[in-house]
Amino acid sequence: MLNSVKKLLGDSQKRKLKKYEQLVQEINNLEEKLSDLSDEELRHKTITFKDMLRDGKTVDDIKVEAFAVVREAAKRVLGLRHYDVQLIGGLVLLEGNIAEMPTGEGKTLVSSLPTYVRALEGKGVHVITVNDYLAKRDKELIGQVHEFLGLKVGLNIPQIDPSEKKLAYEADITYGIGTEFGFDYLRDNMAASKNEQVQRPYHFAIIDEIDSVLIDEAKTPLIIAGKKSSSSDLHYLCAKVIKSFQDTLHYTYDAESKSASFTEDGITKIEDLFDIDNLYDLEHQTLYHYMIQALRAHVAFQCDVDYIVHDEKILLVDIFTGRVMDGRSLSDGLHQALEAKEGLEITEENQTQASITIQNFFRMYPALSGMTGTAKTEEKEFNRVYNMEVIPIPTNRPIIREDKKDVVYVTADAKYKAVREDVLKHNKQGRPILIGTMSILQSETVARYLDEANITYQLLNAKSAEQEADLIATAGQKGQITIATNMAGRGTDILLGEGVHELGGLHVIGTERHESRRVDNQLKGRAGRQGDPGSSQFFLSLEDEMLKRFAQEEIEKLTKSLKTDETGLILTAKVHDFVNRTQLICEGSHFSMREYNLKLDDVINDQRNVIYKLRNNLLQEDTNMIEIIIPMIDHAVEAISKQYLVEGMLPEEWDFASLTASLNEILSVENMPSLSANNVHSPEDLQSVLKETLSLYKERVNELDSNTDLQQSLRYVALHFLDQNWVNHLDAMTHLKEGIGLRQYQQEDPTRLYQKEALDIFLYTYGNFEKEMCRYVARHLGVPENVQ
């Protein structure tokens, strides 16, 4: 098996695999010796390893013996012994790379090895799973091994309170879902005191199903939002107006990027209906925003694909998993636009208070690794964004699943009829069948075709998510037919029922190519686990969503030269090349979009780091607030100077009255010097005129240094002003990001344009925060009457 895997690897990875084999041999050589130790002697190894690390040894120095200790502990506690290939997987993870292991190869047991070794450093290890159920399961299972060896294991899930979270993070190893770790990071950076924070500095994380977390959810921001009111009447009115709009006449929609915009005719129609002269005028900004969100809600979001309506509420659906995203809502009025589209009650609009993408959250970990059954197709992205290699791990038993060649039909109707025939054929043999679909809508379409032939099945999609684990658990029973969204039940094994092995195992049917080969491979991988028999077959049509979105023109050309049989099956061989090529184009498009979004997100990520660093400094009780305020005075004076002493204007044209009033707001001085074109000809002149005044004022501020009550008051006020300005900044950045793609003037790069304008917005935000702090101090000192 190792030799067959080596053939698929590059020279670098072949060398690594050879190195891993040598290390595995060293681990195996220790097995007999460790098996002779008592439980107490084995447990004491943890103390020995910690002492070695404290004395200057490294993780590399202890890993061989540490892995052997974990293997021995697992044998005693769980009755499970790590296979050699699982040891290889553990070594890959320890080095901060991705172990590609087919489902059913025991990834959970593999994770026990590197988590133990890195936990010995005493800085905490996070194990990321895709849902709460798996986090609890893995913590309870593998946690027994680590606790046997003297380590503390914690669980971080949304349902626990902050005090429990703090304990979970103080544990040596903490299990949980990635989004909750991210939300805790955001909450910690909104805390009013250090005592409210629960996390400690990041150290090492292992992500299960890493492709799902870092690729599929890469663009998904984690958002903590407050509520702000929105106009229900205007949302309903805009939804009604949009329903009368015609594609290409009033708006354009790009299915590939899912972006929509109004045409000139569309703009004119809006202006006529609302009786306004210019939709782009500042006074009509709210109307334009509501209209563009109404347009997006109608053309870019499809019911039972992107969302479902349940109990008079819009519930968003994860397009990759088919699961409802509990607690998630769209921001910036888009969720309300969907509610108006469906005629539901309009909820309050969300205003972002803190946000970070999954990508940038996990990039904060100094060391990161992961496991999945399918990552090789995304290796380039993992390497470029996270500096991680994807290393295929040999299977313990050979994979004998038969992956049949795709069949392609002209129409969707012909495809679904062929799916039905395939279901009847394999069901007659008694084999269990799993039918993978792209969306809720498609799963219900397949169900209708099976209903027509009175075929009994179980349907698993976002509308039946509560039964997911039970439905997947029975999907391998004799004669069972299950229709499911492609990723449903991921992390739960489909075990073959009695007698199914002899019939040929589970048969998987794909009803459409996904926009990534990786997800297709995941569906195939539901069959043939751990050396079981199984098969897979994809049924496609030229009306499939991916082909229509990315190759509509090519389809029209292709259909002229195709040969088909009486069922609509395409016999022309080149159709397979066409499908494969289109899927690669689609993957490239998504990669480019993620890369582009990451470039934009890196800008706000840098800004976030500046704000959060300052915020954490403010939370420190020993931070001297006066030392923070003094530089702000100079910055505020400089900002006011730039605002009123406009470059390119004559001094006689400068507004000295407003300049003086603004300075009086931030400086509590008895005798503000007279400012005019007579004594101020440049910003440098202003600094010179104010030099003595500023010096005396700073002395007064410095006298407040010993006032401990004021220090505490300044701390709370600074946190309030900083948080409020950051919320407004995030709002401004959202609008900037939405509009930047439409503003590619001449040859200007939208990324550079975004970076430039984002910097301007950030400088304004930070400057406004500093001015507000200076005003507060001035009010505390009391502005003398003669300068009012």
UniProtKB/Swiss-Prot annotation:
Recorded topology in the membrane: Peripheral membrane protein
Q: Which UniProt keywords apply?
A: ATP-binding, Cell membrane, Cytoplasm, Membrane, Nucleotide-binding, Protein transport, Translocase, Translocation, Transport
One family name in Pfam for this protein: SecA_DEAD
Does Translocase appear among the keywords? yes
**Which SMART domains does the protein's record reference?**
SecA_DEAD (SM00957), SecA_PP_bind (SM00958)
Per the record, its GO cellular-component terms are: cell envelope Sec protein transport complex; cytosol; plasma membrane
Q: Name one GO molecular function term.
A: ATP binding
Q: What is its EC number?
A: 7.4.2.8
**PANTHER family, per this entry?**
CHLOROPLAST PROTEIN-TRANSPORTING ATPASE, SECA INNER MEMBRANE COMPONENT OF SEC PROTEIN SECRETION SYSTEM
Whom does it interact with, and what assembly results?
Monomer and homodimer. Part of the essential Sec protein translocation apparatus which comprises SecA, SecYEG and auxiliary proteins SecDF. Other proteins may also be involved.
Q: Function of this protein?
A: Part of the Sec protein translocase complex. Interacts with the SecYEG preprotein conducting channel. Has a central role in coupling the hydrolysis of ATP to the transfer of proteins into and across the cell membrane, serving as an ATP-driven molecular motor driving the stepwise translocation of polypeptide chains across the membrane.
Which NCBIfam families does the entry link to?
PRK09200.1, secA, SecA2_Bac_anthr
Protein's name according to its UniProt entry: Protein translocase subunit SecA 2
The protein's organism comes out as: Bacillus cereus (strain ZK / E33L)
Which lineage ranks, top first, belong to the organism behind this chain? Answer: Bacteria, Bacillati, Bacillota, Bacilli, Bacillales
What gene is behind this protein?
Answer: secA2
